[in-house]
């Protein structure tokens, strides 16, 4: 399996980097101050697929995604609404978790919150001060960027270029690039009850230190994969790498992986442009798995253009895959109820599995993997009424497993075989239809419907599914 490493700017073989069959993975979560948007959804869904594929390959994945529950934006909203930092953060964490459930994103192994790790953060900062990488000014603690010689390597920017960035201007800092590890309490922090005791006075942690602390606590250093959106490369991940490298003296992360943006009418989605699309709003019009499917239709390192037309195309494509799986399952239930048929032509399931894996091994190329699934669905539809029970089961298990790598159709219930009594009623209904006794045929159909079973008439006889 090959993955693009942002640090090296190269495609690298995962097997050459990961030790054994255990992968440790950290992905930056949301800052919980507002409803989450489809940019958050893209990152969450992609890294969920990354995790699922690693598990498909036989790896045990320890997956950590944090919640930033104390931050300037959270505090500003809390003050504006007359609430505490905790009240604001907990509300939007809860909303985010609802969105993730709708998108069928698996729960991470750990979901730590910043406020639960204040002692760990203080200890980490103290270590950086002792090693000469950080300094204290009037209750604030800053990381001194020039003390870390590898700064800029992740974002591929020189120190001269970085001097031109606006980075927390403060004339007290030793260098314009220095960034906050700990912020002394301000009036807004006190109003929002977002202050914590520390050796440097009451205050709260800076943004970047949080992820260094929590990734090290739950995964150790070094760990295998660090993920996030492309917008986090600088300054967040650059600063995070500097902190962790300075603290532990080793490259903290083996592979840095970043997904690209979602665009609205050719522009990056952002609050400043007023073009934010919230997950919850899309979910009012589309099933969660349709949105999930859409988010996987572009390669993760390419921008994804969001339009209603694109979502409608995704819906139709998703339903094509789903109907193939349902039809196959109905056929399996039919064969179990009314008896097997002789094997038809041999079906090469392994070819589809191989090509799906080739696509995913090629830097998680989900569009190509989806294309293989559509070919597979075409085969299912073409051969549906020629399969033996064994062949149908083999196709079902293979197709369902590959779709599961993308997080699709996992909650779909199997179509049951009918009892002998119900099978006789189906035969009676088919006879009634042939005799044009539609009143009896409809009565039998309605009786099944009352029990949640929908009878479906096909050119090859009656099939059914549970509603």
Curated annotation (Swiss-Prot):
A single GO molecular function term of this UniProt record: ATP binding
Cofactor comment text: Binds 1 zinc ion per subunit.
Enzymatic class: ligase
Signal peptide: none
Recorded catalytic activity of this chain's protein: tRNA(Cys) + L-cysteine + ATP = L-cysteinyl-tRNA(Cys) + AMP + diphosphate
Entry's EC annotation: 6.1.1.16
A family per Pfam: tRNA-synt_1e
NCBIfam families: cysS
Annotated protein name in UniProt: Cysteine--tRNA ligase
Encoding gene, per UniProt annotation: cysS
